[in-house]
UniProtKB/Swiss-Prot annotation:
It is found in: Endoplasmic reticulum membrane. It comes from the Eukaryota. SUPFAM superfamilies: alpha/beta-Hydrolases. Pfam families: PGAP1, PGAP1_2nd, PGAP1_TMD. This is GPI inositol-deacylase. It comes from Phaeosphaeria nodorum (strain SN15 / ATCC MYA-4574 / FGSC 10173). One of its GO terms (biological process) is GPI anchor biosynthetic process. The gene is BST1. InterPro entries: AB_hydrolase_fold, PGAP1-ab_dom-like, PGAP1/BST1, PGAP1_TMD. It is an enzyme of class 3 (hydrolase). Its main location: endoplasmic reticulum. One of its GO terms (molecular function) is phosphatidylinositol deacylase activity. Belongs to the GPI inositol-deacylase family.
Amino acid sequence: MVREKAQVTMGSTTMDMLEDEVVKAQDRRWRLRLRNPWACSAYTLVTTALGFAAFFLMLQSFLTKQLDTKGCEMVYMRPMYSKFDDFDTEHTRFASKYSLYLYREWGIDEEFTVKGAPVLFIPGNAGSYKQVRSLAAESAYHYHNSVQHESNAGKGERRPLDFFAVDFNEDFTAFHGQTVLDQAEYLNDAITFILSLYHTPGRSRRDPHLPDPTSVIIVGHSMGGVVARTLFTMPNYQANSINTIVTIAAPHARPPVSFDGDIVRTQNAVNSYWRSAYAQDSAKDNPLQHVTLVSIAGGGLDNIVSSDYASIASIVPETHGFTVFSSSIPNCWTGADHLAITWCDQVRKSIVRALYDVVDVSQAMQTLPVTNRMRFFKKWFLTGLEDIAEKTLPMTTEATLLTVDVDTAILPQEEQLVLRSLGRSSPNIKAFLLPVPPRDRGEKIFTLLTNERLDGPGEHGRLEVLFCSMSSAQSTQSYLTHLDFAGESPTATKLACKNAASDVIILPESTSHSNFPFRPDQAPFSYLQYDVRDLAQHQFVAVLDKVAHHSAGWVVAAFSASSEATVKVNPSLQRLLYTGISLQLPPRRPLTTEISIPALHSSLLAYDVHISRQKCSQGELFAPLLRQYISDLYESKFFVNVEDAMINVHGRGRPTCRAALSSKSPSNGLSLQIWADPTCDSSIDVTLKVDFLGSLGKLWMRYRIVFAAFPLLVVALVLCQQFRTYDATGVFISFAQSLNECMYSSLPLAITALTFLSITLATAQMQSKKLQALGGPASIIGAFFDNDNELLLGSEDPFFWFLVPLFGIMCTAICVMVNYVVLILTYLFATLYALVRSNRLLDASGQRTPDAFAVTSTRRRIINTLILLSLISTAIPYHFAYVVLCIVQLATCIRGFRLAKEAQLDTNYNFYNYAHSIFILMLWILPINLPVLVVWIRNLAIQWLTPFSSHHNVLSITPFILLVETLSTGRMVPRVRPGISLFTNVFLFAIGAYAAVYGVTYAYVLHHLANILCAWLVAIHFDTLGLAFEDSSKGVAVVGGRSEGKKRP
């Protein structure tokens, strides 16, 4: 009996031991799984694969799809520069850092004395003063060859343009707000010095009867355009010393990067200053009342600064400036990349000719009044087809007396004039009169297209167009020109006429041999378009064929109903995406047809357009010509001899860009204007479809900053899961395992919540715009809900809700990649570290012993920290210290990984996983600090040692220093009580939420949020407030390989 009881007891004990072993084995497997740094679940693997597939498709689309053709002509010049050495420290405190130069063109103007109107060129980010040479050389040649021989009739008195340029030693203004302010201060001093040259004996050869200049014309490239607008906000700005600014590829709407707080605050302050100035009720209260600003953008070829940011619609009213794309500029018609736009021959010629037209050296301000300046800027930079384009016909005098035989010259009402070959008309019929229809017959437009240049008053060319009315009884001597096409006809009638050449619109030539609109060897078309209301004072349109012999010139002209010339397609955006647009233009149609699609206004979508070729029995006069345009930024693109065209736009719907001022007319979306030969009696099929793959590439230029900010949301959620598990179980799981767990819990919830938030914000933004458009009290309510497109991805269309999960997947994939790259580097460096120290880690018996963290004395650590902080407060920016801390933290990770592998203790693995995760967090904060560090290093290279006060704030780096220094001793963070762990979650949630909602616009704040988190972790480490468990000190300090804790199998 006793024996049986003993056997039962032994069996029970054995079973208990077996159960304990099973539990221990399960616990070991659980701990092994949680601490595996290479863990990757199937869900994580699929998400990573999808993320990288989308990312590489986006890059492939950006590099190969929907690309504009490069059409800039190369330029040549023979530059000469003169440095103003006497512009020294007596004039500016930046004399040792920056320099001022005067440009002259060798062989044209070699005298380094001022003689005309001053123009100051401001280079952009890392730009050179030598970039002025293309504009200045063209200015010298244009004045030498043309301007000095032209009449000043209708214009101001003109002299050569004196081009000055500043050498900023290739400063990085895009990264550093203080550099922008320094350059602005220097430029104001330079302007004062430049103006003083014009009344300095020996420096000026200006005509004595001309007044001394009191203002300078500014041309700014890239960030130089932003600096130009900053000049007005500086204390040393001299009132009215600037009244004309032309910027090229300048990011006016937003800073190109938001990693530096100073650049964000500076540009926001400058934009607010300009908005408030133009918002004044009285012109006397507006310090910018005499200032005009034209912003020229390069379009899709600019891969450095998105041309969306070149918009000044939210800063300057249309009365004082506008934004235009180089593809819209007459005789240019091509996009340009960020650097090419400074030397592009077509662009520089338009800029120089516009500047000469607005110059008036007889005035002290050196320019014409604002209204005249704007008229000439519109003439040179806009197509002439825009709503704000001004017609000069009403202001033109009747300078031509035309005598015609009305019996043979007048065409029947509503008949189309077609001259297929100029010079073939009967000798008795050289003038063709189209009767202007009465206004009571509905809305009409007059259009005329020809491949010939239209003659101006008194010119003896090949074709002239006049708008005529019956001559009054005034003397014929008052007319400048007399044209007699009637001979001895008894029905001769005299008509008083105005010449239409000043309103001609230049269009690129489109024939069956045309390939691109910007070919310099092609003569452009001449186009006229008037609303019949503009012709109310006239009875006839006279087309004069002045060619004596048969020629290849042709003319098409007619009055047509406005309703026939406009087709409005207004389906929803969703329907357009699924089915596209298909429509047919009838055989009998006007010369030009405009297709308006209000739903297509987003710059995030790209489209493919196909236009079928029409059949012509007599042959086409010209091939179809397509113009795509969007009125928000006056962006036009022309496609000649078109069958297939790639359409992409900039404008409304652009992310993180503020809406236009109230004076700006609402957008009509994408419009397609087609010129097709109306003599061909055949229909034209037009189809438009969304290019989904091409659209994907548009995300890169608009959302590059997302890939620096959004991953911090993922990192914050991973850290939150790690601390939650550690405080509950004592196991600090690996970053990879925590990411796996987040894939099933917090990450999908966060992305879903952000998706709904994006829909809510976009809907509120749309409603806000509608309410503000109504005016009155509704506009006040609308302004309250207006978020200026600063939140999340900045889109104002709820349709793009899918961008949040799309970027969430891509950023998660990037986080996975970065984690594994860091692991690989840690493994490689740890292996190398072990090989170097292998001979030093043998005990007395020759056996290897685990490596140990070297623990310095507290006094020495305090001294080192104080020395570093003193250097930060005086000599080095905290961004430099942050980079050093990242290197130190990487070394800590390497040592922690090696120790964990050798000691195989749970506490060592806890510490390594903790140190690794902190390093991942610091690594994602690193890009925010690098740009300012680059600026500091650049200043050291040019021996500029003046510190920037905003970058020596020790509080911005002290928590990072203390945390990294603590981790370098191998000290593990203690576990905290459940109530206290809530604060850790709150700090991490704040980082993640801010990164997602505000990270794109205010990325620099993420450094400070991470700094606060570090301060909290330092407080937990030192446990000065009793935050940790009472037994938290047991097994948490990693001191060599003698740490307590469970040993891993």
